[in-house]
A protein has these predicted regions:
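Rossmann-like flavin
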Residues: 1, 228-249
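Glycine-rich loop(s) and the adjacent beta-strand/alpha-helix scaffold that form part
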Residues: 14, 29, 60-142, 300, ...
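Short, well-ordered coil/turn residues at beta-beta hairpins
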Residues: 56, 74-75, 80-82, 165, ...
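A glycine-rich dinucleotide-binding beta-alpha-beta segment and adjacent secondary-structure elements
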Residues: 242-324
């Protein structure tokens, strides 16, 4: 989300698993052991730098202190790739009070703050931990990342439109994630739900990119299909007359290839939203990514909070690091950050 020009490619399966599976294959080929159920309890830092970690092996999430405690000495260094803390409600609420327990997260349950706190305690420089991104395309009728975001973004945001329950567009559907998430939260604060709408033409690219997913959305009641906009509006509690007027105005923008109201980029393949059936899914921002984190030098060495100098033997990459994406990460570009 948020791209103004094409700048990335994706895996055939459309997710990061297509990358991780290849990395695992390479680790097995090189004989690199993968330690599962291993909880890093402490980073061992001395006057000479970082020398290893203390862990609990056989850890049972989320039971703190479970498993067998042992120390692991590093031969050359420790690389921190512990990710973000989007699933840690207390810690993320400290950073940004509005991201409380009422918001779900796209992350797995282990995306917590223990190592964020540990690196802070051993003197690692961190910055902008309150820069936390929500994915605006989430669906409230499923837990976690789910699949509903695929229709909301790939079909409706790119080839349809987003409206509120009053029947009005309220944001540029292709704006960055912060702009869109904030706009949805404002609508919700004023008692209005937000919806992603596409027609028969709008879902065709989605069906091509992700075969079979449209039916899965329908089977799970994440989206609904209607023969007319009137039926859609009545079923979803949207002002029907205003919705039809909004769609008519939007179709004019499509034909003119210009959105003078919200400044949305009109895709050259975009067709007017007028061909039945019409599809709709509800929108709900979910906590997705943390842009702040450890500050590193150009060799990925973590800096000391007192000296701003690299800490010997300590490196970091991925979502654990900061000063990479600014206040709003663009979709997919964290792949290079991790690699």
């Amino acid at each position: 989300g948020g791209h103004s020009v094409p700048r990335y490619v994706t895996t055939k399966i459309g997710s990061g698993a297509g990358i991780v599976s290849k990395q695992l294959d390479k680790c097995h080929e090189l004989g690199i052991p993968i330690r599962l159920r291993t909880y890093v309890d402490r980073i061992i830092r001395t006057a000479d730098g970082v020398e290893g970690v203390e862990v609990f092996e056989g850890y049972r999430f989320p039971k703190a202190g479970s498993g067998r405690h042992r120390s692991l000495k590093a031969n050359k260094g420790v690389i921190l790739c512990y990710g973000g803390f989007s699933a840690d409600v207390p810690y993320r609420t400290i950073q940004d009070p509005k991201l409380n327990a009422t918001l779900d997260t796209t992350n797995q349950p282990g995306a917590t703050s223990e190592l964020w706190r540990e690196t802070s305690s051993i003197g690692c420089l961190q910055a902008q931990n309150d820069w936390i991104q929500c994915g605006p395309w989430g669906n409230p009728h499923e837990k976690g990342m789910g699949i509903g975001w695929q229709f909301n973004q790939t079909a409706a945001a790119e080839y349809g439109l987003w409206t509120n329950s009053a029947g009005n567009r309220f944001v540029n559907e292709l704006a960055n994630r912060k702009v869109r998430s904030d706009a949805i939260m404002v609508e919700q604060a004023n008692g209005r739900k937000c919806f992603a709408i596409a027609d028969a033409n709008g879902v065709k690219p989605f069906e091509t990119q992700r075969p079979g997913m449209l039916n899965k959305h329908l089977e799970r009641n994440l989206i609904f299909k209607y023969d007319t906009l009137d039926e859609l509006a009545k079923a979803q509690g949207i002002d029907a007359e205003q919705l039809k007027q909004t769609v008519e105005e939007f179709n004019g923008y499509v034909k003119n290839k210009k959105d003078p109201v919200l400044g949305r980029y009109i895709n050259n393949e975009q067709l007017p939203v007028e061909t039945a059936p019409f599809y709709v899914g509800e929108l709900q921002p979910k906590v997705h990514h943390t842009m702040g984190g450890l500050i590193t030098d150009d060799k990925c060495m973590v800096l000391d909070v007192k000296t701003d100098k690299p800490i010997k033997g300590l490196y970091a990459a991925g979502e654990a690091t900061g000063h990479v994406h600014g206040a709003v990460r663009l979709g997919s570009v964290a792949i290079l950050d991790c690699l």
